[in-house]
Amino acid sequence: MIDAEGFRANVGIVICNSLGQVFWARRYGQHSWQFPQGGIDEGETAEQTMYRELYEEVGLKPEHVKILAVTKNWLRYKLPKRLIRQGSAPVCIGQKQKWFLLQLTCKEQDVDLLQSGHPEFDDWRWVSFWYPVRNVVSFKREVYRRAMKEFAPTAMALSSKPAQGQRSKRRRKN
């Protein structure tokens, strides 16, 4: 769904473990890393989209996570001109995103990047909470910063609780 201003409605997903680290995934066949995200389909709510994308991209079901927070407002970024598909109608100039902070409640081995027939990611790892803000592609940085700033109090409270057996090493599934 692209709005009148040219922004595609989308959700962003931040999954954290009990150590306050976040799930960071590498785009399939590329060198870029990002959080899971995906477009809202006609008739879907942001929460329904989040669960659909979570399953399609990461292989996790609603019972594998707990929603901790949702951004109060839509966060927007514009695409660089080189990524705007001219000739498509309507023209999408960027994304407007509702972000979800989730707590992983299952074993990390339940992550399955190959769940769909067309994987979005080919590798993943746990990283420190603020790492993605510095390391995502430049045109997404401000949205990441705003989402993470809003989620920080909740995520930091979670990481101050005793760990529940979560490992913090890199996990590869492909």
From Swiss-Prot:
Belongs to the Nudix hydrolase family. RppH subfamily. Residues 6-149 form the Nudix hydrolase domain. Keywords: Hydrolase. InterPro entries: Nudix_hydrolase, NUDIX_hydrolase-like_dom_sf, NUDIX_hydrolase_CS, NUDIX_hydrolase_dom, RppH. Its cofactor is a divalent metal cation. HAMAP family: Nudix_RppH (MF_00298). A motif (Nudix box) lies at residues 38-59. GO terms for biological process: mRNA catabolic process. Gene3D superfamilies: Nucleoside Triphosphate Pyrophosphohydrolase (3.90.79.10). The gene is rppH. This is RNA pyrophosphohydrolase. It is an enzyme of class 3 (hydrolase). The keyword Nucleus does not apply. CDD domains: NUDIX_Ap4A_hydrolase_plant_like (cd03671). Accelerates the degradation of transcripts by removing pyrophosphate from the 5'-end of triphosphorylated RNA, leading to a more labile monophosphorylated state that can stimulate subsequent ribonuclease cleavage. One of its GO terms (cellular component) is cytoplasm. Its EC number is 3.6.1.-. One of its GO terms (molecular function) is mRNA 5'-diphosphatase activity.
